[in-house]
Amino acid sequence: MAENLKRLVSNETLRTLQEKLDFWLKEYNTNTCDQNLNHCLELIEQVAKVQGQLFGILTAAAQEGGRNDGVETIKSRLLPWLEASFTAASLGKSVDSKVPSLQDTFDRERHKDPSPRDRDMQQLDSNLNSTRSQCNQVQDDLVETEKNLEESKNRSAISLLAAEEEINQLKKQLKSLQAQEDARHRNTDQRSSENRRSEPWSLEERKREQWNSLKQNADQQDTEAMSDYKKQLRNLKEEIAVLSAEKSALQGRSSRSRSPSPAPRSRSCSRSRSASPSTAVKVRRPSPNRSKLSNVARKAALLSRFSDSYSQARLDAQCLLRRCIDKAETVQRIIYIATVEAFHVAKMAFRHFKIHVRKSLTPSYVGSNDFENAVLDYVICHLDLYDSQSSVNDVIRAMNVNPKISFPPVVDFCLLSDFIQEICCIAFAMQALEPPLDIAYGADGEVFNDCKYRRSYDSDFTAPLVLYHVWPALMENDCVIMKGEAVTRRGAFWNSVRSVSRCRSRSLSPICPRSQIGLNTMSRSRSPSPIRCGLPRF
């Protein structure tokens, strides 16, 4: 801008303009009309050039001021002058310096109300101050929280050390008591053998009565001592179990404070079931590590197993079924129905198991307030008592009478025993969570829900209805924590209705000839009996 101003001053345009005005004034009366007009137009052109340069300088100066600076000056000086100039030019009057009505209007408005920019600046300042105060408060809270966390860590470490020391002392006491009991038994045996050798043969009958009385007294003393010893031993074991549980809880709390991600619990390999939970209550002691395992860790482990079942076990089951069934839709329907039935059977088994445990533990917890907690802890610690094979048989029985997949009988559902057993175990363990996990209800022909399911690769992505489901969605109360998979097609509702009607029409004859699969050409009756694994299928 300074260069343009220097250039304007160095041109001396205004000085030559004044000289031309003086010359025109002297020659005005002697000139003709055309000459006067030419002089006037020449002066107007020169003034326009100067005015253009001045407007360029004005533009550069306004740009240097930024986005907001200079706005008030342009409103108060330039706009009123332009208004007066255009008004005078349109009316044919001379420009009067007292005309600027817009300037007066802007001055009145400026004195009446503050500008929006000032109000915005004040609002921004107030917001900035409040934000700073909030930031300071958050920083103070963060410092205080760090102090509290450090104190809790120190207390947990001290409690852990004290618990370990007490456990070691109790173990030493238990060993000493066992050694004393063994020594007492050895002394008793030695005394009895010495008394037997010292008896004279002539007084055998008379001493026999005394020996019997002494033996009865010794047996009574031995039984009393054994009962006392068993009570002490039981108390010591209970104290060790409680302290071990506290130790594992403190270790879990310290590990969670160091790393928030829970470690998944290893899957129990034992699937055997004892005769009844009442005998298990008397014989087996619940493992403290498993009973105190956090709900979050068990939930994470079960979600991982459920995801592995979808990504690996489901595909393995599909490979087994594709050897017998060529249609992919039928294979996927069978696996989905097997999963749904497995969850249903596992939930029923969990209810019966919990009722049985509650009845077995009732005499031991008369008048206790933590009865439900004891029942839940026992169920969590003894999930391996679940009879998964019985549930597998129930699932296969339900699949045999399902009208969507049971006819025609082209495959034996016992092929899916391993898959069904894994799903039953996962569903049974999910019922022990707080809150329990369950699968979402799904029906063919329903409206596709993007929150619950994802479409399969061969779906019609513009279809609004579900043709059939591939995998169920996992729910926690009413919240979806793991999406399922569904196939969507146009006209899915009518296709599902026609398929159901065809299946029900075929269900009138449950015995139909078996298709040619491998070497077996036998016909099979579709009875509800779940024992079908003995028949060869390939």
Curated annotation (Swiss-Prot):
<feature type="modified residue" description="Phosphoserine">
    <location>
        <position position="287"/>
    </location>
</feature>
<keyword id="KW-0597">Phosphoprotein</keyword>
<feature type="compositionally biased region" description="Basic and acidic residues">
    <location>
        <begin position="105"/>
        <end position="122"/>
    </location>
</feature>
<dbReference type="GO" id="GO:1900210">
    <property type="term" value="P:positive regulation of cardiolipin metabolic process"/>
</dbReference>
<feature type="region of interest" description="Disordered">
    <location>
        <begin position="173"/>
        <end position="226"/>
    </location>
</feature>
<dbReference type="GO" id="GO:0005741">
    <property type="term" value="C:mitochondrial outer membrane"/>
</dbReference>
<dbReference type="GO" id="GO:0043232">
    <property type="term" value="C:intracellular membraneless organelle"/>
</dbReference>
<feature type="modified residue" description="Phosphoserine">
    <location>
        <position position="85"/>
    </location>
</feature>
<feature type="coiled-coil region">
    <location>
        <begin position="219"/>
        <end position="256"/>
    </location>
</feature>
<comment type="function">
    <text>Key regulator of mitochondrial quality that mediates the repairing or degradation of unhealthy mitochondria in response to mitochondrial damage. Mediator of mitochondrial protein catabolic process (also named MALM) by mediating the degradation of damaged proteins inside mitochondria by promoting the accumulation in the mitochondrial matrix of hydrolases that are characteristic of the lysosomal lumen.</text>
</comment>
<keyword id="KW-1000">Mitochondrion outer membrane</keyword>
<dbReference type="GO" id="GO:0005739">
    <property type="term" value="C:mitochondrion"/>
</dbReference>
<dbReference type="Pfam" id="PF16026">
    <property type="entry name" value="MIEAP"/>
</dbReference>
<dbReference type="GO" id="GO:0005829">
    <property type="term" value="C:cytosol"/>
</dbReference>
<dbReference type="GO" id="GO:0005654">
    <property type="term" value="C:nucleoplasm"/>
</dbReference>
<keyword id="KW-0175">Coiled coil</keyword>
<feature type="region of interest" description="Disordered">
    <location>
        <begin position="97"/>
        <end position="137"/>
    </location>
</feature>
<keyword id="KW-0446">Lipid-binding</keyword>
<feature type="modified residue" description="Phosphoserine">
    <location>
        <position position="509"/>
    </location>
</feature>
<comment type="subunit">
    <text>Interacts (via coiled-coil domains) with BNIP3L (via BH3 domain). Interacts (via coiled-coil domains) with BNIP3 (via BH3 domain).</text>
</comment>
<keyword id="KW-0496">Mitochondrion</keyword>
<dbReference type="InterPro" id="IPR026169">
    <property type="entry name" value="MIEAP"/>
</dbReference>
<feature type="compositionally biased region" description="Polar residues">
    <location>
        <begin position="123"/>
        <end position="137"/>
    </location>
</feature>
<feature type="modified residue" description="Phosphoserine">
    <location>
        <position position="159"/>
    </location>
</feature>
<protein>
    <recommendedName>
        <fullName>Mitochondria-eating protein</fullName>
    </recommendedName>
</protein>
<dbReference type="GO" id="GO:0005759">
    <property type="term" value="C:mitochondrial matrix"/>
</dbReference>
<feature type="region of interest" description="Interaction with YWHAG/14-3-3 protein gamma">
    <location>
        <begin position="1"/>
        <end position="273"/>
    </location>
</feature>
<feature type="coiled-coil region">
    <location>
        <begin position="118"/>
        <end position="187"/>
    </location>
</feature>
<feature type="compositionally biased region" description="Low complexity">
    <location>
        <begin position="253"/>
        <end position="278"/>
    </location>
</feature>
<dbReference type="GO" id="GO:0035694">
    <property type="term" value="P:mitochondrial protein catabolic process"/>
</dbReference>
<dbReference type="GO" id="GO:0140693">
    <property type="term" value="F:molecular condensate scaffold activity"/>
</dbReference>
<dbReference type="GO" id="GO:0035695">
    <property type="term" value="P:mitophagy by internal vacuole formation"/>
</dbReference>
<dbReference type="GO" id="GO:1901612">
    <property type="term" value="F:cardiolipin binding"/>
</dbReference>
<feature type="compositionally biased region" description="Polar residues">
    <location>
        <begin position="211"/>
        <end position="224"/>
    </location>
</feature>
<feature type="modified residue" description="Phosphoserine">
    <location>
        <position position="156"/>
    </location>
</feature>
<feature type="region of interest" description="Disordered">
    <location>
        <begin position="247"/>
        <end position="294"/>
    </location>
</feature>
<comment type="similarity">
    <text>Belongs to the MIEAP family.</text>
</comment>
<dbReference type="GO" id="GO:0005737">
    <property type="term" value="C:cytoplasm"/>
</dbReference>
<feature type="compositionally biased region" description="Basic and acidic residues">
    <location>
        <begin position="181"/>
        <end position="210"/>
    </location>
</feature>
<keyword id="KW-0963">Cytoplasm</keyword>
<dbReference type="InterPro" id="IPR031981">
    <property type="entry name" value="MIEAP_C"/>
</dbReference>
<dbReference type="GO" id="GO:0043231">
    <property type="term" value="C:intracellular membrane-bounded organelle"/>
</dbReference>
